[in-house]
């Protein structure tokens, strides 16, 4: 018995047939096989080439749907996945993008956008941008290359350029093709040029603006620079008149006749509009006059000798120490004279003090000393409330004033202080008079 091969064991692409010599696929199997091959080869995307013009706004959208099929397990036809995807962009061989190229992605569930205005220095040089997509759910990565071939533009740069500040837009909203097209259409109706191009778009945060509060659907604001081949219209020139300049200095909105053509969709801050006329700018470039490249003859070079003369630092050492020491000594002598030789002294103070004041002061001192001496020899009777249970001098225990069987009911509230053996009798003055029975 011959064992079946591996592709015949339940594979949807299994071969079927009657004989050994020829094997054929069924129509259903053929369709499934072709669909699988197409799905696999459709994941292998080749590098993309874009051809922007120098001095003209370049916008490239990194679509999440384009990269979803790069992450295994590959989705089946008709299956919708909403994995969070972020992008990292850099110039090949460098950690960051070119200076003129910016990138923005608001959330992992929104598309990323590369935008900027190519410079004339990069014309004819292919700029390869590495785009790395990260699936934040499965941690899978996919990498593609974007080849930017910058072409030279006609009439570059455009001679008349105007920069508008739109308050009710974010940069990713303004980069949408339909929104940018509506704005250029409104500018074209006001300016009436033959040729009009968007030159650059910059977020207000990149110009030092503040992050808006998350209330009332406030926007960051965006600066949009456009260029044309005809002079500015009278409506755009209205910003430069003195009345509107005064209103702008007072933080009031200027009066612009063509503002209603923008107001339906774009809120423009006319005080921040900038009009640049390239035809009136004076070139500051100065041609460099190159010389012959021969230096003037300075004679023969004489290097310093190898043997250096020894230098005596003893004098410098003495000067360094002597000068501060002398200054310190002079200051010390002056301070000593002031503190010791200029003191008045007690005798001089007494000579200048009146005699009556000295006598009064001496009397006060004598009285104070006498009171202090008398206070040391005081022996008066202590109050009963402060008498201790023992003798304060000998330390003997004092018997109580009354025995335990003493009738305290007849005791008066105010007792006369009895003289104890250790107390000194205080003489009392006796009044003379008659005693009545």
From Swiss-Prot:
Keywords: Cell membrane, Cell projection, Cytoplasm, Cytoskeleton, Glycoprotein, Golgi apparatus, Membrane, Transmembrane, Transmembrane helix, Ubl conjugation. It comes from Macaca fascicularis (Crab-eating macaque). GO terms for cellular component: cytoskeleton; dendrite membrane; Golgi apparatus; plasma membrane; sarcoglycan complex; sarcolemma. This is Epsilon-sarcoglycan. Belongs to the sarcoglycan alpha/epsilon family. Component of the sarcoglycan complex, a subcomplex of the dystrophin-glycoprotein complex which forms a link between the F-actin cytoskeleton and the extracellular matrix. Residues 339-437 are cytoplasmic. Glycans are attached at residue 200. Residues 1-317 are extracellular.
């Amino acid at each position: 018995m011959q064992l079946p091969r591996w592709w015949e064991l339940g594979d949807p692409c299994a071969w079927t047939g009657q004989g050994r010599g020829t094997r054929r696929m069924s129509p259903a199997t053929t369709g499934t096989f072709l669909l699988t091959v197409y799905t696999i080869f459709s994941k292998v995307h080749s590098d993309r080439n874009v051809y922007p013009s120098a001095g003209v706004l370049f916008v490239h959208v990194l679509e999440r749907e384009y990269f979803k099929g790069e992450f295994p397990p590959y989705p089946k036809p008709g299956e919708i996945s909403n994995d969070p995807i972020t992008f990292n962009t850099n110039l090949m061989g460098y950690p960051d993008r070119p200076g003129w190229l910016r990138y923005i992605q608001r959330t992992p569930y929104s598309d990323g956008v590369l935008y900027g205005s190519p410079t004339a220095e990069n014309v004819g040089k292919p700029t390869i941008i590495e785009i790395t997509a990260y699936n934040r759910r499965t941690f899978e990565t996919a990498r593609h290359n974007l080849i930017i071939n910058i072409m030279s533009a006609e009439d570059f740069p455009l001679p008349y350029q105007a920069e508008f500040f739109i308050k009710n837009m974010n940069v990713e909203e303004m980069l949408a093709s339909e929104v940018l097209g509506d704005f250029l259409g409104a500018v074209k109706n006001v300016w009436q040029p033959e040729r009009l191009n968007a030159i650059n778009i910059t977020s207000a945060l990149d110009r030092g603006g503040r992050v808006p509060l998350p209330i009332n659907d406030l926007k960051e604001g965006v600066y949009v620079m456009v260029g044309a081949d005809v002079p500015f219209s009278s409506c755009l020139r209205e910003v430069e008149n003195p009345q509107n300049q005064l209103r702008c200095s007072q933080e009031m909105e200027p009066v612009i006749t063509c503002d209603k053509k923008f107001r339906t969709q774009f809120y423009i801050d006319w005080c921040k509009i900038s009009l640049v006329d390239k035809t009136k700018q004076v070139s500051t470039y100065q041609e460099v006059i190159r010389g012959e490249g021969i230096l003037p003859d300075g004679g023969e070079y004489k290097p310093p000798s190898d043997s250096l003369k020894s230098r005596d630092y003893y004098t410098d050492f003495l000067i360094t120490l002597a000068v501060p020491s002398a200054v310190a000594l002079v200051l010390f002598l002056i301070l000593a004279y002031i503190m010791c030789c200029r003191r008045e002294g007690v005798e001089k103070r007494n000579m200048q003090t009146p005699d009556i004041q000295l006598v009064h002061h001496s009397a006060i001192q004598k009285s104070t000393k006498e009171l202090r001496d008398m206070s040391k020899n005081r022996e008066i009777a202590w109050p009963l409330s402060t008498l201790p249970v023992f003798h304060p001098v000998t330390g003997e225990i004092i018997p109580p004033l009354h025995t335990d069987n003493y009738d305290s009911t007849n005791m008066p509230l105010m007792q006369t202080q009895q003289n104890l053996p250790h107390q000194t009798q205080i003489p009392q003055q006796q009044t003379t008079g008659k005693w009545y029975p």
